[in-house]
């Protein structure tokens, strides 16, 4: 990782003796098969329950695969996220989370301590090396502003999105316990993969089904009623976003 990119996102992995608590957490051991936008969207959904997120950073380059940085508004949120999500099975791989080494540029700019870094002199750089460098995308300029990630794919933050049919969604009237769960109050940006990431950590998980015509709801199937009940008890009220707590019940049959 180049010095500029490392500093911009918080310095990369902390030193072995640990970095001091700060607002940026560094995550590695992430599933490298997940597409970049899906990865950032999933991380934002999982970590937003701990506090306001200013930025989620991940890069396409080979040396940055399997890594990401989440910048919170305050240290308390970052600390709670680190403690709560350490080793969480994110896309079937346990997350390794640490504090980033240095203050990220996004925070330095906000508190007025930001000092631009001088670019390395390249007068003596070999022509072929310079040409190769110029052909590469300058990842140090990707997503470093406070408003770079107002929401997924440039949309408003999930907390600002209207919840379609919020007044119409009601819990099933009489429900017989069974192996299929009915999940409500999901933000519009929720994907089957995001829900699978949450529910697959419980035994007996089979699949997630969503209905495009009815955003905000999903069905999650388990092997038997007992397995479905265990998952429901653990995830009831889980915050997909700060304003979206999952409402889980048994599905009608």
Curated annotation (Swiss-Prot):
UniProt KW keywords: mRNA processing, mRNA splicing, Nucleus, Repeat, Ribonucleoprotein, RNA-binding, Spliceosome
Localization, UniProt: Nucleus, Nucleolus
Region (Disordered): 111-140
Organism of this sequence: Oryza sativa subsp. indica
Record CDD domains: RRM1_U1A_like (cd12246), RRM2_U1A_like (cd12247)
General function of this protein: Involved in nuclear pre-mRNA splicing.
All copies of domain RRM, residue ranges: 23-102, 179-253
Subunit architecture: Component of the spliceosome where it is associated with snRNP U1.
Main location: nucleus
BP GO terms, sorted: mRNA processing; RNA splicing
GO molecular function: RNA binding
Family in the record: Belongs to the RRM U1 A/B'' family.
Stated name of the protein: U1 small nuclear ribonucleoprotein A
GO cellular component assignments: nucleolus; spliceosomal complex; U1 snRNP
Cited InterPro entries: Nucleotide-bd_a/b_plait_sf, RBD_domain_sf, RRM_dom
């Amino acid at each position: 990782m180049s010095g500029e990119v490392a500093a911009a996102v918080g310095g990369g992995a902390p030193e072995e003796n640990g970095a001091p608590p700060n607002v940026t957490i560094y995550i590695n051991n992430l599933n490298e098969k997940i597409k970049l936008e899906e990865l950032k969207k999933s991380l934002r959904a999982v970590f937003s329950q701990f506090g306001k997120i200013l930025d989620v950073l991940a890069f396409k380059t080979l040396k940055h695969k399997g890594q990401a940085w989440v910048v919170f508004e305050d240290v308390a949120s970052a600390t709670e996220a680190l403690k709560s999500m350490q080793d969480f099975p994110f896309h079937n791989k346990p997350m390794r989370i640490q504090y980033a080494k240095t203050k990220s540029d996004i925070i330095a700019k906000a508190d007025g301590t930001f000092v631009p870094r001088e670019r390395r002199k390249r007068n003596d750089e070999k022509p072929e090396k310079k040409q190769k460098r110029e052909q590469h995308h300058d990842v140090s300029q990707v997503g470093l502003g406070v408003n770079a990630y107002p929401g997924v794919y440039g949309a408003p933050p999930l907390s600002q999105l209207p919840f379609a049919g919020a007044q119409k969604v009601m819990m099933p009237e009489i429900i017989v316990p069974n192996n299929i769960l009915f999940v409500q109050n999901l933000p519009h940006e929720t994907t089957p993969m995001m829900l699978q990431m949450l529910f697959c950590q419980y035994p007996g998980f089979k699949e997630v089904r969503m209905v495009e015509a009815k955003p905000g709801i999903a069905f999650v199937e388990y092997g038997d009623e007992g397995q479905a009940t265990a998952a429901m008890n653990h995830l009831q009220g889980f915050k997909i976003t700060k304003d979206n707590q999952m409402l889980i019940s048994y599905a009608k049959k």
